[in-house]
Amino acid sequence: MTTDIHHPEGATGAGAPRLIGLDVTRAIALIGVVVMNYHGFLNDPATGNGRWSRFFHVFTGPLSTRFAATFVLVAGIGTALLAAGTLNKMSGTSHGTLRLRLARRGTVLIVGGYFLNMAWPGTILFFYGAYFLLSALIITLRTRYIAVVGALSATAAVALALWESSRRSAGHSTAWLLPYEIHSAQDLLCRIFLSYTHPVFPWFAFFCTGIILGRNLRNLIHFRTQLTVVCVTILMCTYGLATILSSTGQRDNRVVFVLTTMDPFSHGLFYILSTASIALLAFLIINQTAERFASTKLVMTLRRSGQMTLTLYLAHVLVFYILVKWSDLIGATGLDTSLTFAVCFWIFGISATSLWHHHFGRGPIERLYRLIGG
């Protein structure tokens, strides 16, 4: 096996040490993404209205989009580390070269995601491409300006949600903001920036949060406890206040409801704050646990598989089509089916990709992605 493509589990393609927490977080978050996706397709409305079905509901459940947000946060961290590694490895590398690399990767993802979306509506790859393209514009800015960009993304989402609610209450249609299919440039821009599953407003705020965290990752041990306390406090305040307002009838007010809703498609203030906090907490907990048990077989397996999540993500779509769409071996019979299907895929996928990475290094889709995207 040629060593120029097969790097140790603890090293990046450039030879720099890999951060185990990032890879393990990706591998664990993947099971959540698979569960939510499979449940979204396999939930039978006739049997899927129970408490647990609502809990796992892909659109309205409390877990909806939280796993994907963790992926976006980690992608932001990885982008910050990529930028630092690229500029440090080659001191003569210009900012333009770094921006071009990110733009190439973003273009690959947005084009590939566009076509995948035809078979797998709502795929995050399409939006990932937009995040990378935008990151090419801001990656060399100072951290304070990255924070401003993230805050503007979140603010724009909340402002849009309030405006849309106002228009609907006045009897005006806002359907043009929510194109299910892309037939024009307007549909494309609305899909990327404003609507559907993971639009730039507010999701780029999660990506910017990751960039900021990635730039300060070396000092994480010094502020990890404080950051955890802040995240827990935000969660307690958002969920607690939303519950109190509901019990007192205050959320009957349209503006209050939009600001405090946890519905991911409403893009309210409380949704943004709680989702960012959950993603940060997930990373902090998984990262610390992975570092503590880094030498265990389970963590090593997750570490290898976490470096092949792009391959695993596309594989979960292919497996779904083979077993559900094409052969009808699995049907929409409820939550038990989707959970069993997702867990079986995850166990097999994690084991297979770990074995692949151990023997061959980088995954097949990751190699293609790097070949085209740089």
Model-found features: residue ranges?
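Alpha-helical transmembrane segments and their immediate juxtamembrane cytosolic regions
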Residues: T2-G374
